[in-house]
Amino acid sequence: MSETVVESFTLDHTKVKAPYVRVIETQSGPNGGTITNYDLRLTQPNETAIETGGLHTLEHLFAGLVRDEIDGIIDMSPFGCRTGFHVISWVNYDSETLAKVFKKVLEKIASDDITEVPAAEIESCGNYKDHSLHSAKEWAKLILAQGISSDAFERHVV
């Protein structure tokens, strides 16, 4: 077994109050450069998980829509537990700023303006058949109804 301490394994998942954005950590590289890893938690851990089609579609939608709103996003990867995403950025945003961005992006996803899943073709997606725009829109509406907090442990809805 590894002796490396993985931050997400030390987080008490029974204490957090989703949906929220929190800073996991900021790291400086050995040759310079700094990245920040965020926890974008969309559903309450161990209570609800987003099915793969909806989560996969949110991933594709976030990829472009979030980058349209802010600079420095390196990656947004879904958690294996399907409750949210890691968000990796070159820019060290505070959690309130990112929570506001994701609120705006989820509002776009929930709207009638989004009618297709970007890059959901065999050439551009490794599992192109596993998408559900309907599910992504329903999750966006549910998350917005609950409100996105800028704090993982106390509700500070943006």
UniProtKB/Swiss-Prot annotation:
Gene3D superfamilies: S-ribosylhomocysteinase (LuxS). Fe cation binds at H56, H60, C125. Keywords: Autoinducer synthesis, Iron, Lyase, Metal-binding, Quorum sensing. One of its GO terms (molecular function) is S-ribosylhomocysteine lyase activity. It catalyses: S-(5-deoxy-D-ribos-5-yl)-L-homocysteine = (S)-4,5-dihydroxypentane-2,3-dione + L-homocysteine. The keyword Isomerase does not apply. Coiled coil: none annotated. It comes from the Bacteria. Its EC number is 4.4.1.21. It holds the Pfam family LuxS. Its cofactor is Fe cation. One of its GO terms (biological process) is quorum sensing. Binds 1 Fe cation per subunit. Belongs to the LuxS family. Involved in the synthesis of autoinducer 2 (AI-2) which is secreted by bacteria and is used to communicate both the cell density and the metabolic potential of the environment. The regulation of gene expression in response to changes in cell density is called quorum sensing. Catalyzes the transformation of S-ribosylhomocysteine (RHC) to homocysteine (HC) and 4,5-dihydroxy-2,3-pentadione (DPD). Homodimer. This is S-ribosylhomocysteine lyase. It comes from Leuconostoc citreum (strain KM20). The gene is luxS.
